[in-house]
Structure formats: structure tokens, C-alpha cells
Amino acid sequence: MTSEAMDTLGQYKITVWEEESFQGKRCEFLMECPSIMERGFRKIRSIKVESGPWVGFEYPEYQGQQFILEKGDYPRWEAWSGNSGYRTEHLLSFRPVKCANHNDSKAILYEAENFQGHKFELSDDYPSLQAMGWGNKEVASIKVNAGAWVAYQYPGYRGYQYVLERDRQNGEFKKYSEYSSQAHTNQIQSIRRIQH
């Protein structure tokens, strides 16, 4: 076991079930899982996060839509997709969000790609970026200086979710297509710090 794995042992724990309402085959994880199918599962339909924040993905190898999974119970897909407007009834891969630090999170939003144009510095949650002074519905690039964030397509933490971490891509997302493997738009209207 690597020293990194030893350092995080116990900080992250997730239990997954193959069926809704915590039924069927189950398995506990303390580390990332690039493909639940390699563990003999067809899909994940319910989840219990016991410690640490996690991000779940629609497809194997951390591809597809992202869904933030913070401490709590997720008996059905609606619990993790929330008001996303995007329906995915299962997850096929997941990993811990190791750099989440709710008390020390900083990010800068930019109106143009490559960190150009008008910028907006963040250190708090914003259920509506426009209500807080961001002039438009789009964010073309983001620099995460500390912690981890989840950005949403619409106000009120709704729509597609993009998990943005300081320790991924050095915290630099130069264009919206780097927000996730399935980033369909640069429309971001709410953003919050990930709870640890």
C-alpha cells in the first residue's frame, strides 16, 4: 500500500449497493474505483457516504456526468442527481475528493478562456452568481487556488455539476471543456465549496 493510501485510510469511506434502497450486492470502499464492473457489479443504484466527499461518474474511468457525494445516504438516483435535470440512474466509477477544505477554499472565475477578461474571486458559496455581481451566465475559465468546488449550470445549485479541485489539473481549467469530460456548456450560475 502506498504512503498516500496509508495517509487517507479512514478519511474516506463509501458503501455502494447494486439496487435502490440499499438492497442487493454491496461493497465498501476506502479508495477510488475506476470501474465498479471490475468488482462484479453491473451498476450502483444506492450509496452511503460515511466519511469524506466523493465524486461519482456516469461511466467507467471517471467519464461522463459528475455527481458530488457528500456525507449522507443516497437511496436512489434522485438523491445524488438532485435538480440536475440530467437523469442517470446509476454510477459506474467514483473517487474521493481529497483536497476539499470548506474553511479554506478560494477560486477565481473568468469571463474569457485562458484566465482572461473580467474576473470574480470566490471564498464562499454563491447560490446565484448573477445576484452576487457576476455579469453573465457563462464562465469561460476557472482557477482553483485552494480547496474543491462544485459548480452548477443554473442558480440554486441545479443543472449539470462540475467538480473543480485544486489537485486536478493544478487547479487550472483554461476552458469550459476542461470542467468535465461531458461539459456541454460554459453556463455556470451557482457554485459552492465541497463539504469535508
Swiss-Prot record:
<keyword id="KW-0677">Repeat</keyword>
<feature type="domain" description="Beta/gamma crystallin 'Greek key' 3">
    <location>
        <begin position="105"/>
        <end position="146"/>
    </location>
</feature>
<dbReference type="GO" id="GO:0002088">
    <property type="term" value="P:lens development in camera-type eye"/>
</dbReference>
<comment type="subunit">
    <text>Homo/heterodimer, or complexes of higher-order. The structure of beta-crystallin oligomers seems to be stabilized through interactions between the N-terminal arms.</text>
</comment>
<feature type="region of interest" description="Connecting peptide">
    <location>
        <begin position="99"/>
        <end position="104"/>
    </location>
</feature>
<feature type="region of interest" description="N-terminal arm">
    <location>
        <begin position="1"/>
        <end position="11"/>
    </location>
</feature>
<dbReference type="InterPro" id="IPR050252">
    <property type="entry name" value="Beta/Gamma-Crystallin"/>
</dbReference>
<protein>
    <recommendedName>
        <fullName>Beta-crystallin A2</fullName>
    </recommendedName>
</protein>
<comment type="function">
    <text>Crystallins are the dominant structural components of the vertebrate eye lens.</text>
</comment>
<comment type="similarity">
    <text>Belongs to the beta/gamma-crystallin family.</text>
</comment>
<dbReference type="GO" id="GO:0005212">
    <property type="term" value="F:structural constituent of eye lens"/>
</dbReference>
<keyword id="KW-0273">Eye lens protein</keyword>
<dbReference type="InterPro" id="IPR011024">
    <property type="entry name" value="G_crystallin-like"/>
</dbReference>
<dbReference type="GO" id="GO:0007601">
    <property type="term" value="P:visual perception"/>
</dbReference>
<dbReference type="Pfam" id="PF00030">
    <property type="entry name" value="Crystall"/>
</dbReference>
<feature type="domain" description="Beta/gamma crystallin 'Greek key' 1">
    <location>
        <begin position="12"/>
        <end position="51"/>
    </location>
</feature>
<dbReference type="InterPro" id="IPR001064">
    <property type="entry name" value="Beta/gamma_crystallin"/>
</dbReference>
<feature type="domain" description="Beta/gamma crystallin 'Greek key' 2">
    <location>
        <begin position="52"/>
        <end position="98"/>
    </location>
</feature>
<feature type="domain" description="Beta/gamma crystallin 'Greek key' 4">
    <location>
        <begin position="147"/>
        <end position="195"/>
    </location>
</feature>
